[in-house]
Every structure is written in C-alpha cells, then in structure tokens.
C-alpha cells in the first residue's frame, strides 16, 4: 500500500509516442498532462524511437531532453525504444523491448511497488515471463484486455472497473 509521501511509479507500455498518432498516444498525452503537477505520481512512458509513428520530441513544446533516448514531458520520464524494421512483428518486438526496459529501470532505481500498464495485448506467450518478473520486483501489472483504449477514453461505455484501469 502506498504511503502519503511516497511516489507511485507507473510505467506505460503500448503507445508509439505522445501525441496525435492514435488512441493510445492521445490517452497517454492526456493522462500525463492531467497529472503533471501531482507530486505523488511519476509516469514512465515507453516510446518508439524509429519508424512509423515514432516519437520526435523535437517537435513538441515543453520537452526537457535528457539524452538521445530519454526526455521529460508533462513531468513524465519518457524513454525511446529502437525497433528493427521487421514488418508486422515490430509491435510485438516493441512491447517486449519496452517491458525489458521497464524491468531494468525498476531494478536499477530500486522502485518499490511499481505499476506497469500494458495498453495492448500483443505479447502473447511472453506475458507470463514479464508478469513473473514484475511481480518478483514487487510490482503490479495491468493489461488492457481488449486493446480499445481510445473507445474507453472517449465513450466511457465500458464497465466501471475498466474505466479505473484505463483512465
């Protein structure tokens, strides 16, 4: 259970960028924008470093660049994942690489009780491995089971428990 003065670290995996590319991207943009002044929440957002829909933080106002693959935006720590051009398998590769990066960051920074929110269910047989690793690190995993983030965000016609997970 989180104490009042502790920061809740939330890792977001599944959006290619922060911006107008699609539903997940808009969801993450609005979520981080809405919570940017909250001192007790720290978002860590995985972004695609190259290819279609990749994050180009130089085109976004308010970005603080950390290095070639990390930046701060809306008080969220954003990190870019390099993706090989392997056709439709890019989405799966991105999710697996992003989850590996999340686990590495959690370990290196000794983050207690992290939350990892996976927006799209694309990792299939790899899910169990990451669930075990994140749980072993003291974390919780939330998976958007139907991958309809934009519908949840805009229409709010999902059951109450889905709204809590996605909004």
Q: What is each residue range found by the language model?
A:
Residues 139-140, 150-167:
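Nucleotide-sugar donor phosphate/pyrophosphate-binding loop at the beta->alpha transition
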Residues 23-31:
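Conserved alpha-helical elements of sugar-nucleotide-dependent glycosyltransferases
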Residues 2-5:
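N-proximal low-complexity "stem/linker" segments adjacent to membrane-targeting elements
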């Amino acid at each position: 259970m989180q104490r009042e003065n502790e920061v809740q670290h939330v890792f977001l995996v599944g959006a290619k960028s922060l911006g107008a590319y699609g539903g997940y991207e808009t969801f993450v943009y609005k979520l981080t924008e809405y919570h940017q002044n909250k001192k007790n929440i720290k978002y860590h957002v995985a972004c695609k470093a190259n290819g279609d829909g990749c994050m180009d933080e130089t085109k976004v106002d308010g970005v603080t660049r950390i290095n070639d693959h990390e930046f701060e935006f809306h008080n969220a720590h954003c990190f870019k994942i390099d993706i090989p051009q392997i056709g439709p398998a890019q989405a799966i590769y991105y999710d697996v690489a992003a989850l590996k990066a999340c686990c590495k960051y959690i370990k290196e920074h000794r983050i207690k009780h992290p939350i990892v929110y996976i927006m799209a269910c694309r990792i299939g047989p790899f899910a169990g491995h990451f669930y075990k690793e994140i749980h072993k690190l003291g974390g919780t995993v939330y998976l958007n089971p139907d991958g309809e983030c934009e519908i949840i965000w805009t229409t709010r016609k999902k059951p109450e428990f889905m709204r809590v997970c996605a909004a």
